């Protein structure tokens, strides 16, 4: 029956109404109920024939299912829309989101609940507002759709229409008494969303309906949001309409100019100077009441520059692009505050430009500053850390010197991030645990890349001690992957993933130097994964024993010298020798096998099924157990 259900689903998906009818012809009522309620899984989506037909706009199929087979309109599934995964979506939600008006009318006329919500509390009306379909929006509202239902983030239909730039939908919702001053969880209103996206007609419409100028949860007004996003026309409109004080007006102009200096999509150094100069003139407009800047202390990442405090100082750097770039970063940090989530992005962008121009020292200064800001704000930094591994690898590949203190600094931040991500994984909801675990494992791999890079860097004895301390600190936390792999397991495993943007030019696994360094810093040589495998069990399965003989040989020697038990058994009762996949690893292992009397005794106890639990000291129980 499952095979038939697949054909039924395919016919519904492709709009083949006659094929669908033929497949269901002369079937019993229970069979039909099963076939039309069967949830098919495809590409991460879970849907019934009705849901997929509605999603794809097949009105004839939908009509057949509703009128002839009386399929329930409230079936729910999981669908993908514009890169988003929507759980708990009905056929009506799908039809509204995909813009299939005829299907929407069919479903509503057959009793579909216009206010049914998905798992994230999204309604069919919200889906239509996202897509900008005014005809569907009007129809749903006329059929009692509630315009005030917000999603789980308290984001309303008006907000999503404002953000997506659907002016006609925004106007209609306002006419239907949608609240222009409703706030999302983040404290933002529809005016914030429209201003950020630069939809000036919607900003005008919202102002006409007396939308209030309020701060969001990050202390940002719509004016500041527009300035930070380089939306100059919106800034100028709000300055002409909004009743803002002199300081707010000046800071909006400064923030706008500063943002143009370091924005990938909107970079314009002429506008940077223009708006910074306008703001400076406003500061000095009234000679009796000059509004002085509260400048930040010099910051190393910004070349220890001090922000321009008068028109003459600003004019002096007019032709100096680099100085204007730094001025922009300083101004943004002063106005937005170091803890603002948006402060770090332009710093990272400017650092990337330096890296592209082979000015690595400047790049690293800026990225370290951004990393510290993000960690101070308790932001997820797995991408930032990986970025360092990439640029350090690029430098080594180009024979550029990497400074050991920089590696140590990033390793220290990496340990902190891994510790925080371990706590996130423990305390997160089941729905988000997969993503959190991905980030956490990514951080472990990045840490190993950084350790690998450190082995290829000139270090003083003091620098090496500092690096080793960070490695020790992480080993002490004993982080594990989903498979139970320790750092040592990952270091000896050819399946450990290596990032392919510069990093794989320098880093590879298994890695003898990384293995030795981890062992020197206290890694437990006999630690086991979820299958009971030690690092020795893993390395003897390496499938390049000839071409990479030195790596295989060095790692086996290092592990054995560090106390690896060559007779240790995993959960399948296999020793490393049993797990060897090549003659080379087998020979290498046999030459290192020096069986102690203690190991022989432990194996004899296990081989003869002698009861040893609670008969010998606890430490010896564990020792006998892994033999």
Curated annotation (Swiss-Prot):
Traits of the deletion mutant: Abnormal glucose tolerance predominantly due to defective glucose-stimulated insulin secretion. Mice also show defects in prostate ductal morphogenesis and secretory protein expression.
Binding-site list for Zn(2+) 1: 185
Record-annotated site: Cleavage: 342-343
Repeat found in the keyword field: yes
InterPro entries: Ankyrin_rpt (IPR002110), Ankyrin_rpt-contain_sf (IPR036770)
ANK repeat extents: 45-74, 87-116, 120-149, 153-182, 186-215, 218-248, 483-527, 531-568
Activity regulation comment: Activity of the CRL2(FEM1B) complex toward FNIP1 is inhibited by BEX family proteins (BEX1, BEX2, BEX3 and/or BEX4) in absence of reductive stress. Mechanistically, BEX proteins act as pseudosubstrate inhibitors that associate with FEM1B via zinc in absence of reductive stress, thereby preventing association between FEM1B and FNIP1.
Sorted UniProt keywords: ANK repeat, Apoptosis, Cytoplasm, Nucleus, Repeat, TPR repeat, Ubl conjugation pathway
Pathway given in the UniProt record: Protein modification; protein ubiquitination
Protein name (Swiss-Prot/TrEMBL): Protein fem-1 homolog B
Binding site for Zn(2+) 2: 186, 218
Tissue: Expressed in pancreatic islets, within both beta cells and non-beta cells (at protein level). Highly expressed in adult testis; expressed in all types of spermatogonia. Also expressed in the prostate of neonatal mice.
GO molecular function: death receptor binding; ubiquitin-like ligase-substrate adaptor activity
Gene: Fem1b
Residue sites binding Zn(2+) per the record: 186
GO CC, one annotated term: cytosol
PROSITE patterns noted in UniProt: ANK_REP_REGION (PS50297), ANK_REPEAT (PS50088)
Cited SUPFAM superfamilies: Ankyrin repeat (SSF48403)
Outcome of substituting residue 126 to A/Q: Abolished association with BEX family proteins (BEX1, BEX2, BEX3 and/or BEX4), leading to constitutive ubiquitination of FNIP1
Keyword Hydrolase in annotation: no
Superkingdom of origin organism: Eukaryota
Annotated localization: Cytoplasm; Nucleus
PANTHER family given in the database record: ANKYRIN REPEAT CONTAINING, PROTEIN FEM-1 HOMOLOG B
A single BP term in Gene Ontology: regulation of extrinsic apoptotic signaling pathway via death domain receptors
Family, as annotated: Belongs to the fem-1 family.
């Amino acid at each position: 029956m499952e095979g038939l259900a697949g054909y039924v689903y395919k016919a519904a998906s492709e709009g083949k109404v006659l094929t669908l009818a033929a497949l269901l012809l002369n079937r019993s009522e229970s069979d039909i109920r099963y076939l039309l309620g069967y949830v098919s899984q495809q590409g991460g989506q879970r849907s019934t024939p009705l849901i997929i037909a509605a999603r794809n706009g097949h009105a004839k199929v939908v009509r057949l299912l509703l009128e002839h087979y009386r399929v329930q309109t409230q079936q729910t599934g999981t669908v993908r829309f514009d890169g988003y995964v929507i759980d708990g979506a009905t056929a009506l939600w799908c039809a509204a989101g995909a813009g299939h008006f005829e299907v929407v009318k069919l479903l509503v006329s057959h009793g579909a609940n216009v206010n049914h919500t998905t798992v994230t509390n999204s309604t069919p009306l919200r889906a239509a507002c996202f897509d900008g379909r005014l005809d569907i929006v009007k129809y749903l509202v006329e059929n009692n759709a509630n315009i005030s239902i917000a999603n789980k983030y308290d984001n309303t239909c008006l907000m999503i229409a404002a953000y997506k730039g659907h002016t006609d939908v925004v106007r209609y919702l306002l006419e239907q008494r949608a609240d222009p001053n409703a706030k999302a969880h983040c404290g933002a209103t529809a005016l914030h969303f429209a201003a950020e996206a630069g939809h000036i007609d919607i900003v005008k419409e919202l102002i006409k309906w007396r939308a209030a100028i309020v701060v969001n949860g990050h202390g940002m007004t719509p004016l500041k949001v527009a300035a930070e996003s380089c939306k100059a026309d919106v800034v100028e409109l709000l300055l002409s309409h909004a009743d803002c004080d002199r300081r707010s007006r000046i800071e909006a102009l400064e923030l706008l100019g500063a943002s143009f200096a370091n924005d990938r999509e909107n970079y314009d150094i002429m506008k940077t100077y223009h708006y910074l100069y306008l703001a400076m003139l406003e500061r000095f407009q009234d000679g009796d009441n000059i509004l002085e800047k509260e400048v930040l202390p010099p910051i190393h990442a910004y070349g220890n520059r001090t922000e321009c405090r008068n028109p003459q100082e600003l004019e002096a750097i007019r032709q100096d692009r680099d100085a204007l770039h730094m001025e922009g970063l300083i101004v943004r940090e002063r106005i937005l505050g170091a803890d603002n989530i948006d402060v770090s992005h332009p710093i990272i962008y400017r650092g990337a430009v330096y890296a592209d121009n082979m000015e690595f020292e400047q790049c690293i200064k800026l990225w370290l500053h951004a990393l510290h800001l993000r960690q101070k704000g308790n932001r997820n930094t797995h991408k930032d850390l990986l970025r360092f591994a990439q640029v350090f690898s690029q430098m080594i590949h180009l024979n550029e010197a990497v400074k050991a203190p920089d590696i140590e600094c990033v390793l220290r931040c990496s340990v902190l991030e891994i510790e925080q991500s371990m706590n996130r994984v423990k305390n997160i909801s089941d729905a988000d645990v997969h993503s959190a675990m991905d980030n956490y494992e990514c951080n472990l791999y990045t840490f190993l890349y950084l350790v690998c890079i450190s082995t290829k860097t000139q270090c003083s004895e003091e620098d090496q001690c500092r690096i080793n301390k960070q490695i020790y600190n992480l080993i002490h936390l004993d982080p594990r992957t989903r498979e139970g792999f320790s750092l040592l397991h990952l270091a000896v495993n050819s399946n450990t993933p290596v990032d392919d943007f510069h990093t794989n030019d320098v880093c590879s696994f298994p890695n003898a130097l990384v293995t030795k360094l981890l062992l020197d810093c206290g890694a437990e040589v006999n630690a086991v994964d979820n299958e009971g495998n030690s690092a020795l069990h893993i390395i003897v399965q390496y499938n390049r024993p000839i071409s990479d003989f030195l790596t295989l040989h060095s790692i086996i020697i290092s592990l054995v010298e560090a106390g690896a038990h060559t007779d240790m058994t995993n959960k399948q009762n296999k020793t490393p020798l049993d797990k060897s996949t090549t003659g080379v690893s087998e020979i290498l292992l046999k030459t290192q096998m020096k069986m102690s009397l203690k190991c022989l005794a432990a194996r004899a106890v296990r081989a003869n099924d002698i009861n040893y639990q609670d008969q010998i000291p606890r430490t010896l129980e564990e020792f006998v157990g892994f033999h």
